[in-house]
A protein has these predicted regions:
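His-Asp-centered metal-binding catalytic motifs of divalent-metal-dependent phosphohydrolases/nucleases
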Residues: 61-80, 84, 88, 110-118, ...
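Internal alpha-helical transmembrane segments of multi-pass membrane proteins
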Residues: 102-105, 109
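Generic N-terminal amphipathic, Lys/Arg-enriched alpha-helix
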Residues: 21-31
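Divalent metal-dependent phosphate-bond-processing catalytic cores, especially two-metal-ion Mg2+/Mn2+ enzymes
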Residues: 1-16, 30-58, 70, 98, ...
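Active-site metal-coordination segments of metallo-dependent hydrolases
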Residues: 32-44, 75-90, 104
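Short, charged helix-to-loop "capping" segments that act as catalytic/coupling loops
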Residues: 77, 95-100
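Short coil-to-beta-strand
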Residues: 16-21, 59-66
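An amphipathic alpha-helix signature
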Residues: 18-22, 46, 85-93, 111
Length: 180
């Protein structure tokens, strides 16, 4: 079933394939257990991203979840590692995620979001902007207060300006449920 067929089909496909995709990412992940950049962080970015996506017209929540899974998967340690986003995008390409029914456009957006997420820039694309905002709204975990001026979307700016903290989800099944 294609992940992009229609809203209901997309949600079902993503829910069914999320664990399979994770099973491909985990063995290649260099930061899996990192307290700052590991799988708990990926899940938090996915959860925040889904909150923001629901309030961002034109945002593709599937891409946001894929970004969350891959953006820090190739990070080496918790010290500065600027090329880790490009390595995450390369990992995504190597996994041949198109076989799960994602469109070329979705995969290109996810790769661009991964590749460029550490540059500190803003994006006019609602999906890429949501990805970056979701990651930046977790900066408090490394002692940095998220700032509205570094958010690409209205939802991200509002969350940063208010100091909002997002509820964490405890497992990927909850992320998959929230795609609906």
């Amino acid at each position: 079933m294609p992940a992009v067929a229609g809203r209901a089909d997309r949600v079902i496909a993503a829910s069914l394939d999320l664990e399979r995709i994770l099973s491909l990412v985990r063995p290649s992940a260099t930061s899996l257990v990192s307290m700052f950049h590991g799988e708990d962080h990926w899940r938090q970015v996915a959860s925040i991203g889904l909150d923001l996506a629901a309030r961002t017209p034109g945002c593709d929540p599937i891409v946001v979840v894929l970004f969350a899974l891959l953006h820090d998967a190739q990070r080496i340690g918790d010290d500065p590692d600027p090329p880790h986003g490009a390595r995450g995008a390369a990992l995504a390409r190597s996994l041949d995620l198109g076989r799960f029914g994602f469109s070329r456009e979705q995969l290109a957006l996810m790769e661009a979001a991964c590749r460029d997420h550490t540059g500190g820039g803003l994006s006019d694309d609602p999906t890429i902007g949501t990805c970056w905002d979701a990651d930046r709204l977790t900066l408090w975990r490394v002692g940095i207060e998220p700032a509205a001026r570094y958010m690409s979307t209205a939802a991200g700016r509002e969350a940063a300006a208010s100091g909002r903290r997002f509820a964490c989800v405890s497992d990927w099944a909850e992320v998959a449920r929230r795609l609906g």
